[in-house]
Amino acid sequence: MSFEKSIKAMEQAEKLMPGGVNSPVRAFKSVDTPAIFMDHGEGSKIYDIDGNEYIDYVLSWGPLILGHKNQQVISKLHEAVDKGTSFGASTLQENKLAELVIDRVPSIEKVRMVSSGTEATLDTLRLARGYTGRNKIIKFEGCYHGHSDSLLIKAGSGVATLGLPDSPGVPEGIAKNTITVPYNDLDSLKLAFEKYGDDIAGVIVEPVAGNMGVVPPVNGFLQGLRDITNEYGALLIFDEVMTGFRVGYNCAQGYFGVTPDLTCLGKVIGGGLPVGAFGGKKEIMDYIAPVGTIYQAGTLSGNPLAMTSGYETLSQLTPESYEYFNSLGDILEKGLKEVFAKHNVPITVNRAGSMIGYFLNEGPVTNFEEANKSDLKLFSNMYREMAKEGVFLPPSQFEGTFLSTAHTKDDIEKTIQAFDNALSRIV
């Protein structure tokens, strides 16, 4: 398998863009592998500029839940493009997608469309602070909520301490309004509320942590968040940018039966086009301009192409879609465990709907500290060999893999065999 054209393309890209990319993970640095430039996709497959074919488990980092080049989505996008790409005014497409989102997401009575997941979480925190009149936000270690300043925060020296900047350029003054506690740890959360409860506006959480490699909530964790935030008058915010419509037909909140006050969405609701959204109770959402005084705006918010793609994507998902994801996930999980056991390599497999995470450790993995015990060197070696086998995986141990309705049992069986072949060469 040749990567010659991708290597040359990256050399040129590095002269034009920082690191040659427009999002750091695309540089493949964490797996010490040359970046792969893609050309096109079809169904469950993706093709690079060297002509190599891969079974795709990245799916544009989650949005392509129907696979590449879904014909219904493409056809409706052609119709939308023929009418124009953006108008700076409202369109019927916004109403259609909003109605569908409100119908399926238990917590959302009103929704505001934006252009990215980062924008959704940023605006949601502003809304939570404005609504409650409080300043502090609690987030969980290992949960990623986009790259806004107040969320690029790591934990301090102890449990439930005020945050410290996790990136140059984030002022300490902003970081000090973010409290970071371990994921799946209600005791630490209670300590934070006991110390700062009167000034905590909200708790933001990925109901399934998708940016430490897919870590589901332990039993009672999400309900505990709901109970504690209710007790202290803080808002519970679910960041479902990744989990939205991937964990279940009614998102993670429907699957786990816990309803937050506010929800952030993205990825799947754009069907591969740039989009984000946030929504919640009418009482809270009506604090946003032009009805309320909390300002939020966006030139391309509710873009008709993104709204069309999102609507046509969600309209094809049914409860049966998630039964299909579970059936494929069962086969993949069983196959992975058998192959890794054959080669005497430890593996932990975590699943949530169409999201699957595997860790090269003994497990269990319920938080960021446990995820960090994975064998990162082995992961990098395996990643390179899997690419040679024609399987495109996320180039990071701390990113989940995704299934689509376009994936088949044959894809899964080929993937299991590819892992067997790869491990045979490196173990």
From Swiss-Prot:
Entry EC number(s): 5.4.3.8
Residues found modified as N6-(pyridoxal phosphate)lysine: 267
Cell compartments where the protein resides: Cytoplasm
Biological processes, Gene Ontology terms: protoporphyrinogen IX biosynthetic process
Named cofactor requirement(s): pyridoxal 5'-phosphate
Record keyword Isomerase present: yes
Any one GO CC term of the record: cytoplasm
Keywords: Cytoplasm, Isomerase, Porphyrin biosynthesis, Pyridoxal phosphate
Cross-referenced SUPFAM superfamilies: PLP-dependent transferases
Molecular function GO terms recorded: glutamate-1-semialdehyde 2,1-aminomutase activity; pyridoxal phosphate binding; transaminase activity
InterPro entries (UniProt xref): 4pyrrol_synth_GluAld_NH2Trfase, Aminotrans_3, Aminotrans_3_PPA_site, PyrdxlP-dep_Trfase, PyrdxlP-dep_Trfase_major, PyrdxlP-dep_Trfase_small
Pathway membership, UniProt: Porphyrin-containing compound metabolism; protoporphyrin-IX biosynthesis; 5-aminolevulinate from L-glutamyl-tRNA(Glu): step 2/2
PANTHER family given in the database record: GLUTAMATE-1-SEMIALDEHYDE 2,1-AMINOMUTASE (PTHR43713), GLUTAMATE-1-SEMIALDEHYDE 2,1-AMINOMUTASE 1, CHLOROPLASTIC-RELATED (PTHR43713:SF3)
Family that this chain belongs to: Belongs to the class-III pyridoxal-phosphate-dependent aminotransferase family. HemL subfamily.
Protein name, per record: Glutamate-1-semialdehyde 2,1-aminomutase 1
Organism: Staphylococcus epidermidis (strain ATCC 35984 / DSM 28319 / BCRC 17069 / CCUG 31568 / BM 3577 / RP62A)
Protein's gene: hemL1
